[in-house]
Regions:
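Glycine-rich phosphate/pyrophosphate-handling loop used in enzymes and phosphotransfer proteins
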Residues: 1-197, 201-230
Length: 230
């Protein structure tokens, strides 16, 4: 009864207060969509999940035995994708994170990839307190729920607070040395996991996390991000 009432209330609410596209303000069928169809189809897809080997592997440390590396979208400065990321991370619009998670789950499902779980890149506690949430958790929890697999948001711990500066891959790698460790209270069963982050830039953060995860016996790893920035 209660789910039916909730659905009825949502339908009435949508009738009087229709959802609007975050970008162009056109009406959209559901608030979960975030964008109208026109704006969504103009998001720049990478199609990197279809490429073997992935061209994005070159951004990760070459010694890492990664299965797949892919990103949903290409970052474009001043464009819609940058605006979405900013509103999500810094304005706290978690609906955008849910949207990203739904699109990531759809890509994984349609490309017939199979994972035993999803792992999120952690924030340092200081940065998480300042922001109020870890944006990767929103994406990861949504994706995992839709794929009916577990989300491991606490398997990694960030123990070194690093400055948010634009550096070379080598410099970032040195700064991030020993920045992550495994949480001794969380057990990761053997299997193939997807490590996710919101954006791939130099690859140093994802490489540092991957190195720690791959120290676990009988674990294989792929990497997926929402955006790739050249």
């Amino acid at each position: 009864m209660f789910p039916a009432l909730a659905q009825l209330f949502e339908s009435v609410f949508d009738l009087f207060f229709p959802a609007r596209c975050l970008h162009c303000n056109r009406g959209i069928a559901s608030p979960k969509a975030v964008l109208c169809l026109y704006c969504e189809i103009n998001l720049p897809l990478t199609y990197s999940h279809l490429m073997h080997p992935s061209p994005l592997k070159k951004y990760l440390f070459p010694a890492l035995p990664l299965e797949r590396v892919f990103a949903l979208y290409v970052f474009e400065e001043g464009a819609l994708i940058e605006s979405l990321l900013y509103q999500f991370k810094y304005d706290g619009n978690k609906a955008i994170g849910v949207f990203f998670g739904r699109r990531l789950a759809g890509l994984i499902h349609h490309s017939k990839q199979a994972y035993d779980g999803i792992i999120g890149v952690p924030l340092h506690p200081k940065r998480k307190r300042k922001r109020g949430f870890n944006q990767v958790d929103v994406i990861g929890q949504t994706t995992a729920m839709l794929l009916s697999i577990p989300y491991f948001g606490e398997i990694l711990q960030r123990v070194k607070h690093t400055p948010k500066l634009s550096q070379s891959k080598r410099d970032r790698g040195e700064i991030l040395h020993n920045a992550f460790r495994l949480n001794p209270r969380v057990i990761l069963p053997k299997g193939h996991y997807l490590l996710i982050d919101d954006i791939l830039t130099t690859g140093a953060t994802l490489s540092a996390c991957s190195k720690v995860i791959l120290e676990i016996a009988k674990v294989s790893l792929s990497i997926g991000t929402i955006v790739y920035r050249n």
